[in-house]
Design a protein with these regions (language model features):
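Glycine-rich, charge-decorated loop segments at or immediately adjacent to ligand/cofactor-binding or catalytic sites
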Residues: 112-125
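Structural motif corresponding to alpha-helix initiation and N-cap regions
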Residues: 60-63, 91, 127
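C-terminal helix of von Willebrand factor
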Residues: 123-137
């Protein structure tokens, strides 16, 4: 999934300059992904959502398509949960982000799940934290 985000300029949104954020998530966390999408569609949100999910098997073509999307992104946001530990697709996306030297940040997908994902700095999910991270890219 990718999210296009207007960049803030002196407290205002500059709609001409958008940042692209690739969102890595475990397929078992699709509902959390849908919630993120729903929040980004809120008219009060400074985030614009464009779905670029790839649901094909994790073959060479899938990896090539995901790598291209990550390369085009300004950063990668990972939805972190206990499911992340078993998700080969999400692990590969995170590894790819590191290989491509993209800024990487995690957000906890659930309030009661504080899974530690090695190599991913993770923050609590709220719009202020997400916006600050994106603005700092």
């Amino acid at each position: 999934m990718q999210v296009l985000v207007p960049t803030a300029t002196h407290g205002e949104c500059d709609m001409a300059a958008k940042k692209t954020i690739f969102v890595a998530f475990a397929m078992k966390d699709e509902r959390a992904r849908d919630f993120l999408k729903g929040q980004s569609l809120n008219t009060n949100s400074p985030f614009e959502y464009i779905d670029m999910s790839v649901k094909e098997a994790y073959d060479a073509e899938w990896k090539s398509r995901v790598r291209t999307r990550i390369r085009r992104s300004d950063g990668v946001l990972a939805l972190v949960s206990k499911n992340s530990l078993e998700s080969s697709g999400q692990k590969w996306e995170i590894g790819c982000a590191k290989e491509e030297k993209k800024p990487l940040r995690g957000i906890f997908a659930y309030r009661d799940d504080r899974t530690n994902l090695s190599g991913v700095s993770t923050m609590i999910w709220n719009w202020d934290s997400i916006k600050k991270w994106i603005d700092d890219l």
